[in-house]
Amino acid sequence: MLAAGQGSRYGMPKVLADRGAWLESAVAALWGGGCSRVIVVLGAADTAVPDGAEAVYAPDWREGVGASLRAGLAAASGDPDADYAAVHLVDLPDVHADAVARVIAAAAATESGLARAFYGADPGHPVVMARGHWAAVSRTATGDLGALPYLREHAGLVRRVDCDDLATGADRDTR
């Protein structure tokens, strides 16, 4: 779960928003959606993470979400039992476990192991990717684009998972 940003448009690091309720909600969505391990990538703010989740620090968090994604995938890569990564963001408070579970199931059912939530016509999170994609995603994850360059380059492999019946998928950039 990517939560390293400064939240400059929001006015504070979003990992601290609503006294940590967004963090709790995002971690609960991942646990409830079927993740066996939850890694929270921190940067601008150092805070406790919910019980059972693991905190990882992205030292280059100022570079953008790409740095956070690289840190999270590096941490996941150390687990030989991790076959998939479900990438979720802290600033999506209305995305819950049902959306995570739906995208995980879709990724597991595809040969490519790539699936992404869509809310109407808009791509969103979570994004689920099989381990075989992690190194290439990390190489292309720069700035605030995160996995987008890789997902665009491999668009034909990404399963679109409609989740607009479950959430808006809208990120919260302002208060």
Segments from the language model and where they lie:
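Nucleotide and nucleotide-moiety/phosphate-recognizing core
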Residues: 2-123, 155-163
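Short beta-strand-to-turn element immediately C-terminal to the catalytic PLP-Schiff-base lysine
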Residues: 17-19, 128-130, 172-173
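Short, glycine/charged-rich beta-strand-loop motifs at protein surfaces that mediate ligand recognition
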Residues: 91, 134-141
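A residue-level structural signature of the nucleotidyltransferase/glycosyltransferase Rossmann-like core
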Residues: 92, 126-128, 170
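Conserved nucleotide-sugar donor-binding
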Residues: 124-136
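Conserved alpha/beta core of the MobA/IspD/sugar-nucleotide pyrophosphorylase nucleotidyltransferase superfamily
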Residues: 139-175
